[in-house]
Amino acid sequence: MLPSASVRFRKNAAPPGDSRAIWSQRPRNGGTSAGGRLGYALKNTTNFPCLQGGCKKTEFSIVSFAIGGEIWYTILLIDLRLGIEGVFIHKLAEKKEAPYLEKLDGVRFKMAAPFDFSFLKRYGKVFKVYDDQDSGNICFGVRNENGKRVFVKFAGAPTARYTGQKEDAIASLKNASGLYRALTHENLIRLIESREMGGGWASVFEWTDAICLGRQYPEQHAAFVKLPTETRMKVYRDILYFQSFAAKKGYVAVDLYDSTVMYDVENRRTVLCDIDFYRKMPTVNDMGQMWGSARFMSPEEYELGAVLDEVTNVYTLGAMAFALFSECDRSAEAWPLSSNLYAVAKKAVSEERSARYESIDALLSAWETARGEEL
């Protein structure tokens, strides 16, 4: 018997590339249960374990295929506890025409349509472009004639992946500038200025040569996970201390995941580079599915009306420990550190809020205690 397409997928693991749209929520766009009666050409098949309670209890098989110019996925769910099997067909995205190719100072990048970026000249010449964003922002590395580099985040241009309204992207980036000022910290990227320009809004930050933990940057991710264990321990403590600082200032982290964490190897500095969606507490889930990566999101971040607070962030920070030390694998077998530290991380990612640590400071204290016992 096949369950209906409204069955919600577990979110303890995510496939490479973080295909969160299909992994973490009910099928969209009229997803149907198996049977399909749709002709398709198989592209690839990958199996992923979903780790629950420290053992492999649920398995997914994800197959991508194309139907009439659209990209779809089938998702085979096998629950080893209940013996239920189901196949879901999910429309992933419309196939679009090749995006417009823009060029600035010899650097090519993708856009949905032409746009005038001449306002960037006030900061110098573009040497790097980050165009693969779905937030409505496009980011630039710009260097002036004296060699000073800055990072410019801009909203208001027709980026290749954004499907929302230009005005929403501008409002979001404008609002975020206040967060960087309110949470100024040695481990947060420094905001230089944020203002209207180029028909949109730009925030200008100090440049950093730090490498990113995020999987969307494979070479940097590979370099990050090869850092010595002690270095990654320092990175994790820095993340905990910053989130504790933010909580004391009255903020809850939203959209905190591996791609927001960087490490400057030369200066031995952890850098948090994106707090755009942090919120002032008290706050609740008003979206149904909050911004974020499925590998880091707590159950309440999928529940409309649920409270979002420090306990929510305890879950995310537990998930961050698994990202830093075991490539997001939550099994005891994959954990390279002590069993005491594993117990701390595992408690933090408990599905039930009451089973987690009651605050970020409590998580930090438990981690430091377990670390001390290891030495």
Regions found by a protein language model. Give the residues of each.
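Short beta-strand micro-motifs within the conserved protein kinase catalytic domain, predominantly
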Residues: R190-W201
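Conserved activation segment of eukaryotic-like protein kinases, specifically the C-terminal portion
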Residues: M287-E301
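Activation segment/activation loop of eukaryotic-type protein kinase catalytic domains
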Residues: D264-W291
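ATP-binding glycine-rich loop module of kinase domains
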Residues: G136-S172, G178
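Conserved short submotifs of the Hanks-type protein kinase catalytic core
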Residues: G199-C212
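Juxta-kinase regulatory segment immediately upstream of eukaryotic protein kinase catalytic domains
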Residues: G86-K125
